[in-house]
Amino acid sequence: MKDSDIKDIRSIDVSGLKDWVSSSGQPEYRVQQILSWLYKKRVNSLDEMTNLPQSLRESLKNSFSLDVPKLVRVQGSKDTTAKFLWEFGGGDMVESVLIPANLGDGGDQSNRKTLCVSSQVGCAYGCKFCASGLDGLKRNLNVHEIVGQIIAVENWHAEQTGDFGPIINNLVFMGMGEPLANYKNLIPALAILN
């Protein structure tokens, strides 16, 4: 199998992961362990899944990749709006924006945070108010690239604050691209995130 044929594990839905675990002769509880490593502990490498047997980790590495978006730049800070520029393999770049909520109803600071996520590299629509379409559509983001933005922002926030818990309360797909034009990857990404 060529590296280009290996699918990113974050592009596999729960059903697909169950099928893989079963076909690998592993007990069903391994599915929950793997999901916990991917989405709760937010690992950046399959080797970090230390409660899995080494043989299973090797089998995972032979079957899947785990691509992590590279943070090129962040503007803003941990307590204000932060705009992230991510690079994916191949050099394609997209942005995500972490937006803290305004003051709460009683004038207190709210802990709500919204993440604005990209779904495409560029955009085919060319709306006058938006810079995403200036160079046209380059390509749709894959499922793992959509999901990877959320995980990478959560990890960035943990590095900045020491708080490793989830911080994103709300997702909007209003970053680069038109999300429904990438329906075939958006819906599986939403299923994984849900």
Give a label for each model feature.
Residues 103-121, 125-194:
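Conserved Radical SAM active-site core
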